Amino acid sequence: MVQSHFKGVIPALVTPFRDGEVDEKAFVALVERQIAGGVHGLVPVGTTGETSTLSHEEHRRVVELCVKTTAGRVPVIAGAGSNSTDEAIELARHAKTVGADACLVVTPYYNRPSQEGMYQHYKAINDAVELPIFVYNVPGRTGVDISNDTLERLAKLPNIVGIKDATGDLTRISFQRLMCGPEWVMLSGDDPTALGYMAHGGHGVISVTSNVAPDACSAFMNACMQGEWEKGLYWQDRLVRLHKALFLDSSPAPTKFAMAQLGLCTEDVRLPITACAEGVRPAILEAMREAGLR
């Protein structure tokens, strides 16, 4: 079953920079730290990985490096989103070529296609690349919201296997579970509501917070997957302020600030994202302390 392969806590990895370039040494160390922390998969070059400000060459290199470093220990779901269908196909083909286990394709942004346009976008990728494809729905960033009716149609295609749902709307998951069938993989894209998402039948979370706290995020998700809700609630209470603190400024700047405090990478981000504002740093540090990180 696809669900047995893609589940649990799956960090949306940051892309570390140093002196304006991708810091490959730091990236490899981040991958190793996540795997040692017990995560169940990895997502390179997603939103948190600043894919929109990576060159195509950098994007491809980060995917290759993630696959090589992971060496099959956990599945790699490579970011392959674009508002150009042809470009998304190209990125998905590259992900398959270098050995990624799946790709994550955000709904087309800026050009704001209709529901039929989104269906045809994903169908074209499905037809072009034999690789598991996750739909990524994040209307707060893209300006479009893929409907459950469209997802039901997409679920009938052989390579469209599931969704990363970053809407935070927990009512959607029950309908998706009923409409898309038992093989449909449902991954939350919202750390703060992941507990509820799992209780509604979800299979995991593509997590920002795991960049900072992989051990705690893994413990939380293991509890949820085992139906140990009291234990899951313990970890939820310990992590919830950190979940929120990592979005007190434009992401991933707060996450990189937190990681820099742990000596994991620099704070460097690429414009138009700027370094985490001084005014929110104390709240991030306090949330880290509450999560047992300082």
UniProtKB/Swiss-Prot annotation:
<feature type="site" description="Part of a proton relay during catalysis">
    <location>
        <position position="47"/>
    </location>
</feature>
<dbReference type="GO" id="GO:0019877">
    <property type="term" value="P:diaminopimelate biosynthetic process"/>
</dbReference>
<keyword id="KW-0456">Lyase</keyword>
<dbReference type="GO" id="GO:0008840">
    <property type="term" value="F:4-hydroxy-tetrahydrodipicolinate synthase activity"/>
</dbReference>
<feature type="binding site">
    <location>
        <position position="48"/>
    </location>
    <ligand>
        <name>pyruvate</name>
    </ligand>
</feature>
<comment type="pathway">
    <text>Amino-acid biosynthesis; L-lysine biosynthesis via DAP pathway; (S)-tetrahydrodipicolinate from L-aspartate: step 3/4.</text>
</comment>
<dbReference type="GO" id="GO:0005829">
    <property type="term" value="C:cytosol"/>
</dbReference>
<protein>
    <recommendedName>
        <fullName>4-hydroxy-tetrahydrodipicolinate synthase</fullName>
        <ecNumber>4.3.3.7</ecNumber>
    </recommendedName>
</protein>
<comment type="subunit">
    <text>Homotetramer; dimer of dimers.</text>
</comment>
<dbReference type="InterPro" id="IPR002220">
    <property type="entry name" value="DapA-like"/>
</dbReference>
<feature type="site" description="Part of a proton relay during catalysis">
    <location>
        <position position="110"/>
    </location>
</feature>
<keyword id="KW-0457">Lysine biosynthesis</keyword>
<dbReference type="Pfam" id="PF00701">
    <property type="entry name" value="DHDPS"/>
</dbReference>
<keyword id="KW-0704">Schiff base</keyword>
<feature type="active site" description="Proton donor/acceptor">
    <location>
        <position position="136"/>
    </location>
</feature>
<feature type="binding site">
    <location>
        <position position="206"/>
    </location>
    <ligand>
        <name>pyruvate</name>
    </ligand>
</feature>
<keyword id="KW-0220">Diaminopimelate biosynthesis</keyword>
<keyword id="KW-0028">Amino-acid biosynthesis</keyword>
<dbReference type="InterPro" id="IPR020625">
    <property type="entry name" value="Schiff_base-form_aldolases_AS"/>
</dbReference>
<dbReference type="InterPro" id="IPR005263">
    <property type="entry name" value="DapA"/>
</dbReference>
<keyword id="KW-0963">Cytoplasm</keyword>
<comment type="function">
    <text>Catalyzes the condensation of (S)-aspartate-beta-semialdehyde [(S)-ASA] and pyruvate to 4-hydroxy-tetrahydrodipicolinate (HTPA).</text>
</comment>
<dbReference type="InterPro" id="IPR013785">
    <property type="entry name" value="Aldolase_TIM"/>
</dbReference>
<feature type="active site" description="Schiff-base intermediate with substrate">
    <location>
        <position position="164"/>
    </location>
</feature>
<comment type="similarity">
    <text>Belongs to the DapA family.</text>
</comment>
<dbReference type="GO" id="GO:0009089">
    <property type="term" value="P:lysine biosynthetic process via diaminopimelate"/>
</dbReference>
